[in-house]
């Protein structure tokens, strides 16, 4: 099991494959993705690497973190994430990981924070059909209707689909295909959509499940 990477979402575009078909892709950019610290079985009880990416201003970095970066001999990083790895995949502190870490055609799992939509109704949040447009319905056209309970059980069950806060959740999309990489510019092109807004930090790992045949 090897380390994943930290990348930043640039946006979406489309590219053409060898068959001349256009493929929608999300462009991710890697900037200064380096190993900041390591975790070992002897010292920590498990094996992992801590990666840092992006550039943070020194004045915005705490004194404790400045000390950690100084020990690793790397510039202050804007984003830190820890990845569990096997002992044979443990990287040295200061090692930089580039876009060539992934190969075209391989499958990856991508983790990001979805775009927040605020308080949303049941129609937008869950795809409900709403109530009738006429025939006695007034004001409640976009309502979710009955919550489905009466004296017994006398309550609304947890996880009932209702209006509420939508988005701004941590989501992992599995088995996305890497279309191509550009190591010189630090770009990874991933087929399809990736959770998060433009500029959001994205975690990319090797896929843990095989794709459905």
From Swiss-Prot:
Any single biological process term in GO: translation
Keyword Cytoplasm among record annotations: no
Modification after translation, per record: Methylated by PrmB.
Domain of life: Bacteria
Keywords: Methylation, Ribonucleoprotein, Ribosomal protein, RNA-binding, rRNA-binding
UniProt cross-references to InterPro entries, sorted A to Z: Ribosomal_uL3, Ribosomal_uL3_bac/org-type, Ribosomal_uL3_CS, Transl_B-barrel_sf
Modified residues (N5-methylglutamine): 151
Molecular function terms, GO-annotated: rRNA binding; structural constituent of ribosome
GO cellular component: cytosolic large ribosomal subunit
Quaternary data: Part of the 50S ribosomal subunit. Forms a cluster with proteins L14 and L19.
Protein family membership: Belongs to the universal ribosomal protein uL3 family.
General function of this protein: One of the primary rRNA binding proteins, it binds directly near the 3'-end of the 23S rRNA, where it nucleates assembly of the 50S subunit.
Name of protein: Large ribosomal subunit protein uL3
